[in-house]
């Protein structure tokens, strides 16, 4: 068992429970009893504003901020539970609904079948099996956000993330082969060998810049078609039930307008087909994430095919700086902060001088082409106070952040509006 020893001689072993104070960073050995924050209880709807002096002050300030802010505040939510919580916290819609989790768990087998399909019939069977499951997910999320916009990002990660690890699978098959040859063990199945071939084929040296997002949708067009149909059918079902779904379809990792045009054409055809089949037409916006630097620099062209932009500032920061976030944060960020390369991680607070310029260029050129273009941000920066102020001044329409950061974003959006008004008056 792996262990470490603290300065006072305490030994901590693998599996021991630790508690961490999220404010101070102090670590406690064992499980520390906790009680819900009264402020969180207030936002959850379990505590009235006049029940606690602190809560009363928070209520007063947040209401004042809401009355002053120009920026809308949405949330990043992938489930109906997260969506409902965000709504209680004051979220005005979902700015990012990731669909990746809808392909995990028991559904992973269908993705494997899709990848291993040897013909159109097998591929269609795998997609048909996923359709009702996706539709149920969207019915739940659209229902939780009834009357508010829900921006659904079509599948973004590379397919290999839904497959077994290359090294582990290779070792497993090599061991099985050796046992079969030496001791007459069970032979490796054709399915496992086909799976290994697929994992090798899809393995990438730098998957963040590889076959993902819109590129995946163009290589396997049925995948995006499945998701668009599930969105349309879910919205039609809810509308028949008297609800008011407001879906928005967001295409990830677009770098050229031609990519978006191809996906948009197919999406519009599917939306029209579902409207004809169900007798229900649901107005659905189609837009894109701006997360590739080239997309920001050619935003005027991309706006010709997009009804909205949403900045994916996590990936935009990675590509703009040339950072691989998973590698660099632990490798040298603390040193960069110590020597003053930057004062805070650019993944926590937006780099206004560099990445911020890309944002401003995209806003200006996008709206020059399409004045009604709706623009938001759905990266983690959407809940960062300093970044929220930048987005206000850059002219964005809304920010989107995790449910628990929604109150912070509401407050900072109000402060940004007041500061801007004070500056204008001077």
Locations of regions flagged by a protein language model:
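Conformationally flexible catalytic loops at phosphate/diphosphate-handling active centers
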Residues: 1-10
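Short, Lys/Arg- and Gly-enriched loop/turn segments at beta-strand edges
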Residues: 24-33
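Conserved alpha/beta-domain cores
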Residues: 39-41, 46-426
């Amino acid at each position: 068992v792996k262990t470490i020893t603290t300065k006072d001689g305490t030994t901590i072993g693998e599996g021991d429970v630790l508690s961490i104070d999220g404010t101070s960073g102090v670590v406690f050995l064992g499980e520390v009893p906790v009680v819900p924050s009264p402020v969180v209880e207030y936002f959850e709807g379990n505590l009235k504003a006049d029940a606690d002096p602190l809560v009363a002050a928070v209520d007063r300030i947040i209401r004042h901020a809401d009355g002053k802010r120009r920026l809308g505040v949405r949330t990043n939510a992938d489930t109906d539970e997260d969506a409902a919580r965000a709504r209680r916290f004051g979220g005005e819609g979902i700015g990012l609904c990731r669909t990746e989790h809808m392909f995990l768990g028991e559904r992973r087998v269908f993705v494997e079948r899709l990848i291993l399909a040897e013909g159109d019939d097998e591929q269609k069977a795998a997609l048909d099996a996923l359709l009702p499951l996706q539709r149920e997910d969207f019915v739940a999320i659209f229902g939780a956000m009834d009357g508010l916009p829900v921006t659904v990002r079509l599948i973004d990660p590379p397919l290999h993330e839904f497959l077994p690890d290359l090294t582990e699978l290779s070792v497993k098959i090599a061991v099985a082969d050796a046992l079969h040859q030496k001791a007459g063990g069970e032979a490796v199945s054709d399915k496992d060998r086909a799976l290994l071939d697929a994992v090798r084929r899809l393995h990438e040296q730098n998957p963040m810049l590889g076959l993902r997002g819109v590129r995946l949708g163009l290589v396997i067009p049925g995948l995006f078609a499945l998701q668009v149909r599930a969105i349309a059918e879910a919205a039609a079902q809810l509308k028949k039930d008297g609800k008011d779904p407001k879906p928005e379809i967001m295409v990830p990792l677009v770098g050229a307008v031609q990519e978006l045009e191809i996906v948009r054409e197919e999406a519009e055809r599917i939306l029209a087909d579902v409207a004809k089949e169900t007798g229900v037409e649901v107005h659905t916006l189609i837009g894109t994430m701006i997360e590739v630097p080239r997309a920001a620099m050619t935003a005027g062209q991309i706006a010709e095919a997009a009804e909205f932009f949403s900045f994916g500032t996590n990936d935009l920061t990675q590509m703009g700086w040339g950072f691989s976030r998973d590698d660099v944060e632990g490798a040298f960020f603390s040193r960069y902060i110590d020597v003053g390369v930057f004062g805070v991680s650019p993944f926590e607070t937006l780099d206004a001088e560099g990445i911020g310029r890309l944002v401003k260029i995209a806003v200006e050129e996008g709206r020059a082409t399409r004045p009604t273009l709706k623009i938001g941000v759905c990266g983690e920066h959407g809940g960062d106070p300093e970044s929220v102020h930048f987005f206000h001044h850059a002219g964005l329409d809304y920010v989107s952040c995790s449910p628990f950061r929604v109150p912070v974003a509401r407050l900072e959006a109000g402060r940004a509006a007041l500061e801007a008004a004070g500056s204008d008056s001077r």
